[in-house]
Amino acid sequence: MAEAIAGGLLAGKLCKPDQLWATDPVAARCDRLKSQFGIRVGSDNHDAVTWAEIVILAVKPQSLPEVLKEIGADLNRVLVLSIVAGSTLRSIREQAPGTSRIVRAMPNTPVFVREGMTALAFGAGCSEDDMSVARTVFEAVGRVVSVEERLMDAVTGLSGSGPAYVFQAIEALADGGVNMGLPRQTAELLAAQTVLGAAKLVLESGEHPAKLKDRVASPGGTTIAGLHQLEQGGFRATLMGAVEAATKRSQELGR
C-alpha cells in the first residue's frame, strides 16, 4: 500500500520524486521503486527518518517492534502515519517514547486504483496542521474519514474487509449471468460496472441507498422479484453478519 500512496502523491503533484524516500531491506524492491517512481531508496531506516518530516510506517505487524527499536528515538520530531494493521496509537507511543504526533490509518485495497477508503484516528499530540497533512496524503488515493480509534475494528470489518465482500458479490452476479446464458467476459463486465456505477450514484446523489433501490423496483417488475429472492436468502443479514464477524476477529487479533 505504501507504493500506492507514493504513486498517488506523485500523480497528484503533491510532492516531487526527490521528496520521497522509501526503505526496504530487499535491494531488488528498492531498485524497482527507484525505476518506477524515480524516488530516493535505500535500506537504512535511520538515514531516511533523519532526513524526513513525515514518516509512513508500512511494515508487517510482526516487524514493527524491530523497526521502532531502530528508529523510535528519531520519531519525536516528525509526523508519523501508521498503516500497520492492528497497531494502536498507544502501542506505537510505548515502543517509541516521546513520539506524540501519530496518526493511525486504515486504508483498503482500492487505494491501488486511487479509489480507496481510509479511516484516520489522530493521536492527542497531533495539531490541526498534522491532521490536514494526513488527510491530504490519503486523499491522494481515495476518500478519507476521521474516526475515534475505538472504532477502528469496525472500520476493519466494513471498509477494510469490504472489498472482498464486494468481489464475491461481483463474482456471484457474473455467475448468475453466465447461468442465464451470458458469456463469462460480458457477465463480469456487466457485474463490475453495475457495482461501480451504483456506488458512484450513492456517493454523488447523497440519497439513502433504500430510496435509490426503490426507484429501480417497479411494482410487479423484474427488480422487485430479484430483491424478494435476496430477502429470502438473508442477503442483508448475511452482509451485516460478515461485518460483525470481521470486526470481532479484528478485536481478537488486537488483544
Language-model regions: role of each:
Residues 40-45, 145-147:
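Short acidic-hydrophobic, aromatic-tinged amphipathic segments that line or gate anion-handling sites
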Residues 1-43, 50-51, 178-180:
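NAD(P)+-binding Rossmann beta1-loop-alpha1 motif at the extreme N-terminus of oxidoreductases
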Residues 91-101, 117-154, 167-204, 249:
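Internal alpha-helical scaffold of NAD(P)-dependent oxidoreductase catalytic cores
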Residues 192-255:
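NAD(P)-dependent Rossmann-like dehydrogenase/reductase catalytic/cofactor-binding core
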Residues 21, 27, 37, 45-120:
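Rossmann-like NAD(P)(H) cofactor-binding subdomain of soluble oxidoreductases
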Residues 103, 152-157, 209-214:
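Short pre-catalytic strand/loop immediately N-terminal to key active-site residues, enriched for Gly-Thr
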Residues 20, 30, 48, 183-190, ...:
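Small-residue helix-packing motif on alpha-helices
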